[in-house]
């Protein structure tokens, strides 16, 4: 679907990092932003995982903020909803989590840590064309992509799933991929 993006540590701050030639250090996060194609249709899924198998306390805190934002967006997905509403939901959920961590006091500053939109179309292209000003319709497929980037902590991460709009909500097509701190740490401990 596209060249895989694999980045460790602060290289995650380069959203489409294309030079995976650096050594990854103990304690760093590794971003895996990958896709697959079938009959010319593509996917786009991202996860981060700790190089040493365990999230640090700060990494886990930020990961949970992004996870909660990702899930808040999924709860809003249904026919008739507009993409800008989902982007707003992601920013609002991220703000609440970042505020609780003492990183933000004013919603106007959210772009300091949330650098990209929360949704984009997938299909014939990774960032497929589609009307962002048109409401969602049943059987549309797009990403839910919550990302948080805190340079002063040296932590950047995103959780990106592919979802299918259903009559009453959405189906997470990438639900089988571990996505919570606990699921990822468990997987890392067994491999």
Where on the chain are the PLM-derived regions?
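Active-site neighborhoods and metal-handling regions in enzymes and metal-associated proteins
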Residues: 1-191
């Amino acid at each position: 679907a596209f060249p895989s993006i694999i980045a460790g540590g602060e290289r995650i701050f380069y959203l489409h990092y294309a030079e995976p030639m650096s050594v990854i250090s103990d304690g760093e996060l590794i971003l895996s932003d990958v896709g697959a194609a079938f009959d010319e249709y593509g996917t786009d899924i991202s996860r981060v995982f700790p190089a040493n198998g365990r999230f640090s306390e700060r990494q886990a805190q930020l990961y949970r903020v992004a996870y909660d934002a990702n899930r808040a967006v999924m709860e809003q997905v249904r026919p008739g909803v507009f993409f800008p509403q989902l982007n707003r939901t992601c920013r609002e959920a991220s703000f609440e989590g970042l505020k609780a961590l003492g990183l933000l006091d004013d919603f106007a500053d959210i772009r300091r840590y949330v650098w990209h939109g929360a949704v984009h179309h997938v299909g014939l292209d990774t960032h497929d064309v589609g009307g962002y000003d048109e409401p969602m319709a049943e059987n549309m497929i797009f990403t839910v992509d919550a990302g948080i980037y805190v340079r002063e902590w040296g932590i950047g991460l995103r959780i990106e799933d592919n979802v299918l709009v259903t009559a009453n909500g959405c189906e997470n097509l990438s639900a089988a991929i571990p996505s919570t701190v606990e699921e990822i740490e468990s997987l890392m401990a067994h491999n």
